[in-house]
Each structure stands twice: as structure tokens, then as C-alpha cells.
Regions:
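Alpha-helical residues within the helix-turn-helix
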Residues: 38, 55-56
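N-terminal helix-turn-helix DNA-binding core of bacterial DNA-binding proteins
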Residues: 4-45, 68-77
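Amphipathic alpha-helical dimerization/coiled-coil segments
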Residues: 78-127
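Beta-hairpin "wing" of winged helix-turn-helix
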Residues: 56-65, 72-74
Length: 127
């Protein structure tokens, strides 16, 4: 890590939608884009743009499974230099009313794409 990548990391945190996405990803090992969209009640284009920015800043990683794109926080390994920063950020999120609302909504909307598309359950079961 150098100062340029560190600056990009902190710049990635300077937007409320990106902070809300990070808060959700701190709650789950990984999330499908459709779960993030449904939880935050934002358009797909907005969420995708912010996820792309977080990916550029090396804050999130993604993987494709069938038609779905999943995102995760790779920084949650103790060996990563910013691991403890994210732990501190999680504690800060616990004191944020908007963040608590998002977490509560996530528990209600989790796996939205699977629930709204019965064929997805068959695809996921095959893997």
C-alpha cells in the first residue's frame, strides 16, 4: 500500500451511499447486488456506480454466479493493513441511525433475487 492507494481508499469513504454499502457488507460475508439495491431502495445504476468506485479503491471484490454479481469486503482479514480501521468503522456504524435502519431492512430483504425468481433457487442448488 502506498499513499496514492491510501488516498483512494479514504476518498472512497467520502460518499454516504458508499458508506451505507460498506455497512451492509460488514454485516454479511457477501451480498448480491440485488440485495443491496432492495435494501437501500436505490436505482441499480446508482448502486452499480458506487460499487464500481469501491472496487476501484480496492475496498470490495466481486464474483459472478450465474446472472448475479456478488460483492464482499476482502479487507476483513487481519493481515490487511486496514483491517482494524474497518473494525472501528463497524463500531461507528453501530451508533448511526441510518445504518441501523439499513441493517434491519437487510434482514427483511436478504436473498431478494432468489425469492423473486424461483428458477434462481434451482441454479443455486446445482452449485
Amino acid at each position: 500500500m502506498n499513499t496514492t492507494s491510501l488516498a483512494l481508499f479514504y476518498k472512497s469513504l467520502s460518499e454516504p451511499v458508499r458508506l451505507r454499502i460498506i455497512n451492509l457488507l460488514l454485516q454479511q460475508e457477501e451480498l448480491c447486488v440485488c440485495d443491496i439495491i432492495t435494501t437501500l431502495t436505490l436505482p441499480q445504476s446508482v448502486v452499480s456506480r458506487h460499487l464500481a468506485y469501491l472496487k476501484k479503491g480496492a475496498i470490495v471484490t466481486s464474483r459472478r454466479q450465474g446472472n448475479w454479481q456478488y460483492y464482499a469486503l476482502p479487507l476483513m482479514t487481519p493481515s490487511h493493513p486496514l483491517h482494524y480501521f474497518l473494525i472501528s468503522l463497524r463500531q461507528t456504524f453501530e451508533q448511526c441511525a441510518d445504518c441501523a435502519h439499513d441493517v434491519a431492512r437487510l434482514s427483511q430483504t436478504m436473498n431478494y433475487c432468489l425469492k423473486s425468481n424461483p428458477e434462481a433457487l434451482l441454479i443455486q442448488g446445482d452449485q
